[in-house]
Amino acid sequence: MPRWEEKNLIEEGKKLGYQVATIYSKDFVLFSNDFTIDNDTDLFIQRNVSHNRALITSFLVEQVGYPVINDHTTLIRCENKIFTTYILARHNIPTPKTFIAFDKTNAIEYSKKLGYPVVIKPVEGSWGRMVAKADNLDVLYSYLEYQEFSTQKYKDIYYIQEFVNKPNRDIRIFVIGDETPVGIYRVNENNWRTNTALGAKAYPLKIDEELRELALKVKDIIGGFFLGIDIFEDKDRGYLVDEVNGVPEYKNTVRVNNFNVSKFLLEKAAEWVKK
């Protein structure tokens, strides 16, 4: 079922005079020896909730020769937290201290070196699901054991991060093309996780020059056209880039900022296609 964002994109596209069509993954078929799509389309905008479907459909559309927002390479870099963190860190983007381990012994040893509490995250996932904070060894061991016997695709790879003692909020900035038109604070008074899916409230954000430059640097490194960038505030180190979303939701951003993200995205995408 389309979310608010997809419905709004269709509505705003029609207002702008564009011909807008919705293609559902379940109806999408492409033969390997017939690289054609029976569709008079200038641009595809990827809005799959499922990462696997988003990745594969973007890839297939690209093979036919259509531009797509976002391309499959960007989606890989965004969805896989290992790719995101290590690509950004290699390019000197400030990120939370993170390590990857491939067995529990190393995960435990290096968590001690990192210092408790630590945060355990699934390699892929969104909305704060299965993200846990371990305050000590006993709690960490329980989470590692749970992951080991779970059905996660990367259950034998441990992504462990420092716990950033941020305010009870984080920052979400949207990059569209080469601009940072809007952002929000996500504030959670009842949970250290600041995802709106877990009860965080959205508030308007005034994007300063430092934030704008940081977000655009991330976009240049990760790629893509439309990104949602999650940033922590650390009292000593300043801004830390935590995650990047390649198919971002923005309903709450529109609501609190009174900013038409769909219209802005469509207009900028139309300019991009014409170049």
UniProtKB/Swiss-Prot annotation:
Cofactor(s) annotated in UniProt: Mg(2+)
Annotated pathway: Amino-acid biosynthesis; L-lysine biosynthesis via AAA pathway; L-lysine from L-alpha-aminoadipate (Thermus route): step 1/5
A GO BP annotation: lysine biosynthetic process via aminoadipic acid
Domain (ATP-grasp) ranges: 85-270
Binding site for Mg(2+) 1: 230, 243
GO MF annotation terms: ATP binding; coenzyme F420-2 alpha-glutamyl ligase activity; metal ion binding
GO (cellular component) term, any one: cytoplasm
Top-rank taxon: Archaea
Motif (N-[TS] motif that is essential for LysX substrate specificity): 252-253
Binding residues for Mg(2+) 2: 243, 245
Enzyme type, top EC level: ligase
Catalytic activity: [amino-group carrier protein]-C-terminal-L-glutamate + L-2-aminoadipate + ATP = [amino-group carrier protein]-C-terminal-N-(1,4-dicarboxybutan-1-yl)-L-glutamine + ADP + phosphate + H(+)
CC cofactor note: Binds 2 magnesium ions per subunit.
Pfam families: LysX_preATP_grasp (PF22626), RimK (PF08443)
Reported function: Catalyzes the ATP-dependent formation of a covalent bond between the amino group of alpha-aminoadipate (AAA) and the gamma-carboxyl group of the C-terminal glutamate residue in LysW.
Protein name: Alpha-aminoadipate--LysW ligase LysX
